[in-house]
């Protein structure tokens, strides 16, 4: 069952390891045609895809770097604004403290002035009431003294002018004795 080709090949005496020159030519032409198609059509398409991908990656990296730079600039701007806001808040707080201290000082001054005014009014009113009470007391003491003296003497001492002089003189003497007693 040996095939006829094998028998012929054995008969011719050709080496089976060395291919036929026509086969080599067909394989070389086929390979060259395949390489031409690959180089002419497939490689440019692959190269274009590769280049597009490289450009997309580089563009993405450039966009990322640009976005990072913008983010850094925005962050620096934000930090600057935040520092300015903190400075402004501190200034406003200090202004408010100063204003509050001024308001408290003014209120304290007004309260002190009002208290002094009320105290002086009260002192003046007390002095006026004391004088009024002293004058009324002198009149009542004089009237009682005249009535009592009239009862002791047994006659009426109703002469107003004369009795008033006596009472005034008595009260003046009494005031002098009290002043002298206080001075001692």
From Swiss-Prot:
Pfam families: ATP-synt_B (PF00430)
UniProt entry keywords in alphabetical sequence: ATP synthesis, Cell membrane, CF(0), Hydrogen ion transport, Ion transport, Membrane, Transmembrane, Transmembrane helix, Transport
Protein name: ATP synthase subunit b
Cellular component per GO, a single term: plasma membrane
Principal location class: membrane
Gene3D superfamilies: F1F0 ATP synthase subunit B, membrane domain (1.20.5.620)
Similarity-based family: Belongs to the ATPase B chain family.
Membrane topology qualifier: Single-pass membrane protein
Assembly and binders: F-type ATPases have 2 components, F(1) - the catalytic core - and F(0) - the membrane proton channel. F(1) has five subunits: alpha(3), beta(3), gamma(1), delta(1), epsilon(1). F(0) has three main subunits: a(1), b(2) and c(10-14). The alpha and beta chains form an alternating ring which encloses part of the gamma chain. F(1) is attached to F(0) by a central stalk formed by the gamma and epsilon chains, while a peripheral stalk is formed by the delta and b chains.
InterPro entries (alphabetical): ATP_synth_B-like_membr_sf, ATP_synth_b/b'su_bac/chlpt, ATP_synth_F0_bsu_bac, ATP_synthase_B_chain
Molecular function terms from GO: proton-transporting ATP synthase activity, rotational mechanism; proton-transporting ATPase activity, rotational mechanism
Functional note: F(1)F(0) ATP synthase produces ATP from ADP in the presence of a proton or sodium gradient. F-type ATPases consist of two structural domains, F(1) containing the extramembraneous catalytic core and F(0) containing the membrane proton channel, linked together by a central stalk and a peripheral stalk. During catalysis, ATP synthesis in the catalytic domain of F(1) is coupled via a rotary mechanism of the central stalk subunits to proton translocation.
Gene: atpF
Cell compartments where the protein resides: Cell membrane
Transmembrane segments: 24-44
Domain of life of the source: Bacteria
CDD domains attached to this UniProt entry: ATP-synt_Fo_b
């Amino acid at each position: 069952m040996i095939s006829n080709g094998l028998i012929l090949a054995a008969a011719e005496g050709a080496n089976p390891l060395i291919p036929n020159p026509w086969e080599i030519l067909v394989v070389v032409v086929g390979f060259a045609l395949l390489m031409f198609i690959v180089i002419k059509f497939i490689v440019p398409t692959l190269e274009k895809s590769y280049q597009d991908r490289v450009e997309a990656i580089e563009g993405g990296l450039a966009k990322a770097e640009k976005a990072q730079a913008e983010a850094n600039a925005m962050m620096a701007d934000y930090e600057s604004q935040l520092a300015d806001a903190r400075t402004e808040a501190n200034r406003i707080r200090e202004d408010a403290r100063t204003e509050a201290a001024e308001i408290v000082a003014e209120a304290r001054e007004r309260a002190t002035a009002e208290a002094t005014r009320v105290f002086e009014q009260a002192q003046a009113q007390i002095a006026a009431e004391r004088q009024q009470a002293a004058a009324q007391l002198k009149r009542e003491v004089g009237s009682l003294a005249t009535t009592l003296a009239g009862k002791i003497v047994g006659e009426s001492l109703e002469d107003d002018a004369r009795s008033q002089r006596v009472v005034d003189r008595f009260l003046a003497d009494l005031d002098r004795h009290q002043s002298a007693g206080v001075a001692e």
